């Protein structure tokens, strides 16, 4: 039977409670079987020398998710090295999990920057997007009307961005309850 799996990519420098809450919300609201955390070796939009080593970020992720059976860490991008392009990772995972249904978790900033990614049309053609909407902060319908996204989405009429609106607690709300 096909599993519902979502890829949660990022630098995770470091992973924090916000990431874990987003993953939990995705599990529940999108009825996922698994969230695959995918730390980037070198994020193309964050080529920064202040990143912790890939090994350290993988270890932090593993410690953060070890008690959650539906969370898994994949070192795929770090093992591959170099700049981590989502289109390459998605293509590899589709071949690695041919019988599963894959989704890509994107926050509002990542969704808006999607047109600047490598081969964004191919990404949209290969995988479903789980768009994170921070309660009271973001509105996915409004974001998809932004000119840069409209242009990408209108390039091919056959593309339909299938977004599951995932409502996550805002980071402001999180910070208020950390103490």
Task: Show where each model-derived region lies.
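Short beta-strand/turn micro-motifs composed of small residues
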Residues: 8, 39, 106, 131-133
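Short, aromatic/basic amphipathic alpha-helical patches
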Residues: 141-152
């Amino acid at each position: 039977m096909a599993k519902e799996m979502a890829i949660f990519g990022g630098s995770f420098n470091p992973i924090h409670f916000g990431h874990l809450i987003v993953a939990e919300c995705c599990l529940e609201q999108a009825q996922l079987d698994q969230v695959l955390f995918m730390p980037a070796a070198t994020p193309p939009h964050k080529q920064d020398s202040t990143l912790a080593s890939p090994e350290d970020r993988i270890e932090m992720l593993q410690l953060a998710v070890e008690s959650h059976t539906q969370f898994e860490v994949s070192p795929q991008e770090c093992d591959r090295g170099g700049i981590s392009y989502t289109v390459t990772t998605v293509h590899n995972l589709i071949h690695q999990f041919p019988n599963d249904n894959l989704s890509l978790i994107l926050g509002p900033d990542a969704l808006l920057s999607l047109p600047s990614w490598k081969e964004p049309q191919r990404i949209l053609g290969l995988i479903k997007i789980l768009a994170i909407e921070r309660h009271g902060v973001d509105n996915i319908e409004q974001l998809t009307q932004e000119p840069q996204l409209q242009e990408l989405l209108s390039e091919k009429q056959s593309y339909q961005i299938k977004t599951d609106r995932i409502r996550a607690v805002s980071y402001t709300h999180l910070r208020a309850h950390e103490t």
